[in-house]
Amino acid sequence: MKRRSVNASVIIVTGVNFVEYLMELGLKIGNKVKQQVGVPEWIKSDRGFSRACVRGLFDTDGGTFYHRHWVNGHKYCHFGLTFTSSCKPLLSSFKECLELDGIRSYGEKDCLFVYRVGDIGSFFSIYKTRNLKHVHRFRRYLSRSTRCD
């Protein structure tokens, strides 16, 4: 419907039509973990879409952490990123997208981890998380020594 008073159109999407449209795009109805769904190919094949997808996944199911450990009597703190999901294809899709951008990640059961400082910096630079808490933590980490003692 065209509005005559302004240069704009009104678009109305009903629930059924919208769901059918999303299904045509390759998305599925229902529990994503039970169905073990990954990221649709049309998203993975477009760099902009895949980056937006990774950003959204990280912002909802990702996090940052400090890995503290001892070596030769000295306590060290290292920074890391993590993405967690019980959906194996989703983890795999997330990892694929990172690899396309040259970011190394390591998996363990339901988690992916990014440990290298350069890769973490690249991650924040490329994917531009909307959760600035993680960016602030990383900057704080960079301003310190990795030794904790």
Show where each model-derived region lies.
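Internal intein/HINT superfamily modules and their associated LAGLIDADG
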Residues: M1-D149
